[in-house]
């Protein structure tokens, strides 16, 4: 599964001298037990456990905390993209100004991924090896510059998300404007 790719990459990044906390937050809670078996030493949020200083992994298998996790993160690796599932929607990550790494499977949200990559907020990696390389680049930037990517890139991505969120309202207005006007008898 995808989590094995992430866990292996995380171990390699730690060995390269970049300690970090990998938080795996499954999109579907029914996957928590399978993921927990892959990382038996990790604290589990569903058991009211929190990671300790020096822990490398944490299973955030709770509901309603994703935006808090993303806000606290220096980098997000978006799932559903290292296996042929099409990638999860990257707009929430971009809206919270967090640098994003994604795998190659992006067919569900291709336009959003392409646009965020143009703004420099998102990077696509092809496999675990290129994930390790990109993580070490951004973690080194965090270490030396205090940020993985320039704030200007994050600001541009945020502006794009704001425009994207306006799309449904604009579409609804176009539809409503084309509806025939009916006269109701008094």
Short names for language-model regions:
Residues 1-186:
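Nucleotide-activated sugar donor-binding and catalytic core shared by glycosyltransferases
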């Amino acid at each position: 599964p995808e989590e094995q790719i992430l866990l292996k990459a995380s171990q390699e990044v730690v060995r390269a001298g970049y300690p970090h906390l990998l938080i795996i937050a499954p999109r579907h809670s029914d996957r928590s037990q399978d993921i927990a078996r892959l990382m038996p030493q990790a604290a589990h949020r569903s058991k009211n456990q929190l990671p300790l200083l020096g822990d490398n992994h944490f299973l955030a298998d709770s509901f309603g905390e994703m935006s808090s996790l993303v806000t606290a993160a220096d980098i997000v690796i978006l799932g559903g993209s290292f296996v042929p599932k099409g990638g999860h929607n990257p707009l929430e990550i971009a809206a919270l100004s967090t640098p994003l790494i994604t795998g190659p499977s992006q067919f569900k949200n291709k336009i959003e991924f392409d646009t965020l990559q143009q703004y420099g907020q998102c990077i696509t990696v092809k496999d675990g090896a290129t994930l390790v390389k990109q993580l070490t680049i951004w973690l080194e930037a965090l270490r030396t510059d205090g940020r993985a990517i320039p704030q200007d890139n994050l600001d541009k991505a945020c502006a794009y998300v704001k425009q994207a969120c306006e799309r449904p309202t604009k579409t609804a207005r176009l539809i409503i404007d084309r509806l025939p006007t009916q006269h109701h008898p008094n």
